[in-house]
């Protein structure tokens, strides 16, 4: 770190769906940050959970914004806009901000010591595109960060940037050193990623299990996600032979069920 004083952090995240992931994330951060994280600014994208969110650990602000219609028209959500507005309108008194997905959380008290002045998770498989599951940077640079950059291009161009993919480039242009964090696979390579030397876990698409995104209903199996949630609470991030058997059976049942639904109801059938 360029300063002699120990950095302090405010977490920024957005919530959608049920409270499982956001509650677990904040509980883990509070337990494993050694007091370095002093608050959390949460965007309620469910727009109905403000009271419940205010009762969670570390929460200092719950923000609710009008939907960004242009972004929602692209993929059914306005996550980039929500994070941008949180940085612009939230109250920050700490030296640093940590943006985290609600289904990302530390698993070791060493995670804070692994953070540099600017530390940004990379999208798995990329050497430049950054991911909002974990982004730490000085609060004074929040005006530089734009999670929405080029996001609307996804409506016309396959492979256009998703949420926060340009943040690494934006912060590099400030001239400050930027540490890009590579992932290692979790759950035997089938689900989730570790960052910061295995001290931080990101599940990925966790909120879709309880959310209302029709286009993502077939992206994750709700039955399989129940197993992963159970293992997360047990602090176990690998699968047993019995787990593999159960996941395979659920996968086959889901494929057969969705094919039958498609045959009976046609293109209007939503995958489950």
Please report, for each region that a protein language model flagged, where it lies by residue.
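C-terminal catalytic/acceptor-binding lobe
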Residues: 164-272
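Short, charged/polar "capping" segments at the starts of alpha-helices
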Residues: 18-22, 46-53
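A conserved hydrophobic helix/loop-capping motif in glycosyltransferases and polysaccharide synthases
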Residues: 9-18, 32
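Short beta-strand-to-loop acidic/aromatic patch adjacent to the donor-nucleotide binding site
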Residues: 94-105
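Short beta-strand/loop segment that forms part of the nucleotide-sugar
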Residues: 37-48
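Short, acidic, metal-binding catalytic loop of nucleotide-sugar glycosyltransferases
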Residues: 27-37
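Active-site-proximal specificity loops/subdomain of glycosyltransferases
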Residues: 48-93
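Conserved catalytic core of nucleotide-sugar-dependent glycosyltransferases
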Residues: 105-173
């Amino acid at each position: 770190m360029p300063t002699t004083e120990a950095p302090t952090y405010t977490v920024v995240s957005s919530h959608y769906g049920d409270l499982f992931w956001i509650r677990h994330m904040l509980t883990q951060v509070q337990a494993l940050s050694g007091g370095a994280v002093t608050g959390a600014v949460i965007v309620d994208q469910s727009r109905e959970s403000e009271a419940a969110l205010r009762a969670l650990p570390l929460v200092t602000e719950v923000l609710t914004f009008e939907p960004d219609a242009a972004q929602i028209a692209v993929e059914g959500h306005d996550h980039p806009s929500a994070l941008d507005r949180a940085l612009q309108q939230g109250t920050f008194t700490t030296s640093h901000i940590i943006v985290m997905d609600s289904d990302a959380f530390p698993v070791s008290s060493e995670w804070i010591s692994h953070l540099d002045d600017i530390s940004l998770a990379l999208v798995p498989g990329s050497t430049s595109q950054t991911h909002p599951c974990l982004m730490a940077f000085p609060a004074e640079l929040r005006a530089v960060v734009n999670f929405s950059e080029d996001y609307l291009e996804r409506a016309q161009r396959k492979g256009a940037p998703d949420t926060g993919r340009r943040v690494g480039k934006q912060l590099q242009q400030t001239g400050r050193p930027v540490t890009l964090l590579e992932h290692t696979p979790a759950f035997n390579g089938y689900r989730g990623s570790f960052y910061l030397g295995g001290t931080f876990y990101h599940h990925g698409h966790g909120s879709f299990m309880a959310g209302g995104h029709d286009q993502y209903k077939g992206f994750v199996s709700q039955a399989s996600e129940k197993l992963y949630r159970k293992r997360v609470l047990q602090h176990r991030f690998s699968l047993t032979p019995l787990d593999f058997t159960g996941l395979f059976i659920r996968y086959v049942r889901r494929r057969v069920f969705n094919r039958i639904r498609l045959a009976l109801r046609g293109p209007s059938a939503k995958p489950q």
